[in-house]
């Protein structure tokens, strides 16, 4: 079986500053993985390279493969990357919705990667695509808001619309870049539970960048910690220690980053809740 994600020797430099350094990573189909680390550690940069939204260095840049297909190598994107992106759902921190469009129309945009360009440019969605979008909205609890303008939704609701768009896209790999960074605790919990449910029930590979370690421990079996463009930890999220996190986050480490007994209990409760769904 092909790896869902394979990264080898990935290097990225911005203005002579290394953002990713000889990075290697393998993720198996159906895994849910948290990328953690302080701001500027390379989490979002790595995620963008996985989706082919950024190119690695041309000299010794490395290689990225998703679902057994090459996304990029040595600073050059695969000429067929648009087709590959149809299998990669990308969820942005700031939602990336079209505010003037309805919730349903935003979700239907997930179909564009599998449509002829002429039909997509005219927004000619068929009944099967519309039904699929409504099923996705039902799953994230927003079917009753399908006709509402996206601009009227709360941040948590907009992020759930973005998840529904990825479901409508029928993506095999979902990449979520700080999806809960700007959300209140209840909205953050709901977004993470939806992503975990998609991973568990649908077998989708989910990679999520998180600044909040307690959410990583609660919802992601595996964690990969980055610091200064290098991987410093790759293992079970529950094995992350307070000492390691203090070293990882440095001056940014505070009570919200620490794994407490309470967060461990909440994690177990969340897993039990998901098992009953």
UniProtKB/Swiss-Prot annotation:
Binding residues annotated for ATP, in chain numbering: 37-44
Reactions it catalyzes: phosphonate(out) + ATP + H2O = phosphonate(in) + ADP + phosphate + H(+)
Group of enzyme by EC: translocase
Keywords recorded for this protein, A-Z: ATP-binding, Cell inner membrane, Cell membrane, Membrane, Nucleotide-binding, Phosphonate transport, Translocase, Transport
Gene Ontology CC terms: plasma membrane
Subcellular location: Cell inner membrane
Domain ABC transporter, first and last residues per copy: 5-253
Gene3D superfamilies noted in UniProt: P-loop containing nucleotide triphosphate hydrolases
Domain of life: Bacteria
Disulfide linkage: none
InterPro entries xrefs: AAA+_ATPase (IPR003593), ABC_transporter-like_ATP-bd (IPR003439), ABC_transporter-like_CS (IPR017871), ABC_transpr_PhnC (IPR012693), MetN_ABC_transporter-like (IPR050086), P-loop_NTPase (IPR027417)
Its biological purpose: Part of the ABC transporter complex PhnCDE involved in phosphonates import. Responsible for energy coupling to the transport system.
UniProt protein name: Phosphonates import ATP-binding protein PhnC 2
Protein source organism: Pseudomonas syringae pv. syringae (strain B728a)
């Amino acid at each position: 079986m092909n790896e869902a994600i394979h990264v080898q020797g990935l290097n990225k430099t911005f203005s002579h500053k290394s953002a990713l350094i000889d990075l290697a990573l393998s993720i198996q189909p159906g895994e849910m993985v948290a990328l953690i680390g302080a701001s500027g550690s390379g989490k979002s940069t790595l995620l963008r390279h996985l989706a082919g939204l950024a190119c690695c260095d041309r000299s010794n840049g490395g290689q990225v493969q998703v679902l057994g297909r090459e996304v990029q190598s040595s600073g050059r994107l695969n000429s067929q990357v648009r087709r590959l992106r149809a299998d990669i759902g990308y969820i942005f921190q700031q939602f990336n919705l079209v505010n003037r469009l309805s919730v349903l129309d935003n979700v239907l945009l997930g179909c564009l990667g599998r449509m002829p360009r002429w039909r997509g440019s005219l927004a000619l969605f068929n009944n099967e695509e519309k039904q699929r979008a409504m099923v996705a909205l039902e799953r994230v609890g927003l079917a009753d808001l399908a006709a509402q303008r996206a601009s009227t939704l709360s941040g948590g609701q907009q992020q759930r619309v973005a998840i529904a768009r990825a479901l409508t896209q029928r993506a095999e790999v979902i990449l979520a870049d700080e999806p809960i960074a700007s959300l209140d605790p209840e909205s953050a919990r709901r977004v993470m539970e939806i992503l975990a449910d998609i991973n568990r029930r649908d077998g989708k590979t989910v990679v999520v960048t998180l600044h909040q370690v307690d959410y990583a421990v609660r919802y992601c079996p595996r964690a990969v910690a980055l610091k200064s463009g290098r991987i410093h930890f790759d293992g079970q999220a529950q094995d992350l220690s307070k000492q390691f996190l203090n070293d990882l986050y440095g001056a940014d480490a505070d009570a919200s980053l620490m794994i407490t007994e309470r967060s461990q209990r909440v994690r177990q409760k969340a897993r039990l809740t998901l098992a009953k769904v």
